[in-house]
């Protein structure tokens, strides 16, 4: 039976299972997939922090539903999605390589279609995702926004994990420890 960490995300209370990673570190696992009420709550709270941005970008997969809610709340008809593998429709897109995240443990790449890259060009871009921990995934998104010619306006996360809670360049709704 898993242990749990109880958290409060701006009034939304939930319990996160504590799970071990292969490197021996334990994390409080945050999963928005399939949880419509939590996604709506977190997306609306992040949207309050995103005022002034022209477009939202996220990385698949857990950020997708957040980006949808934030964009809807801001009245934006589109948001950009960085994919973790190159899709058929991305032949004329852009890509960046970045380091390993705490959950994958391996170097990765992010891909952006030409359509989504064009959405970012010259725009104030708000990066939205579920959790920031090591900052490697964020670095990949920042590099992608810069490569597309966007202007990084805000970096918003539901949770800041571990040392990420001390970063001054990001905003979060709650913090969790590395265990």
Residues covered by each model-derived region:
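Short glycine-rich phosphate-binding loop at a beta-alpha junction
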Residues: 53-60
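Conserved acidic residues
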Residues: 54, 123, 153
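Short Gly/Thr/Asp-enriched flexible loops that form oxyanion-binding sites at enzyme active sites
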Residues: 65-74, 141-142
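Short, glycine/charge-rich flexible loops or terminal/linker lids adjacent to PRPP-binding catalytic cores
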Residues: 78-125
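Active-site-facing substrate-recognition patch
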Residues: 1-53
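Short, hinge-like loop/turn segments at secondary-structure boundaries
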Residues: 74, 96-101, 171-174
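PRPP-dependent phosphoribosyltransferase catalytic core
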Residues: 2-6, 139-179
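Gly/Ser/Thr-rich loops at beta-strand to alpha-helix junctions
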Residues: 60-66, 134
């Amino acid at each position: 039976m898993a242990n749990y960490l109880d958290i409060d995300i701006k009034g939304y209370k939930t319990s996160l299972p504590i799970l071990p990673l292969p490197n021996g570190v334990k994390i409080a696992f945050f999963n928005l997939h399939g949880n419509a009420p939590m996604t709506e709550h977190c997306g609306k709270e992040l949207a309050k922090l995103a005022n002034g941005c022209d477009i939202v970008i996220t990385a698949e997969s857990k950020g997708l539903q957040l980006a949808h809610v934030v964009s809807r709340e801001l009245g934006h008809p589109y948001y950009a999605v960085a994919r973790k593998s190159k899709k058929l429709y991305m032949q004329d897109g852009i890509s960046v390589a970045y380091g390993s995240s705490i959950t994958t443990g391996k170097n990765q790449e992010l891909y952006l279609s030409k359509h989504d890259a064009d959405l970012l060009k010259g725009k104030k871009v708000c990066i939205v995702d579920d959790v920031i921990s090591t900052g490697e995934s964020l670095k990949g998104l920042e590099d992608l926004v810069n490569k597309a010619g966007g202007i990084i306006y805000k970096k918003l996360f539901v949770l800041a994990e571990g040392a990420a809670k001390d970063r001054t360049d990001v905003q979060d709704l709650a913090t969790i420890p590395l265990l």
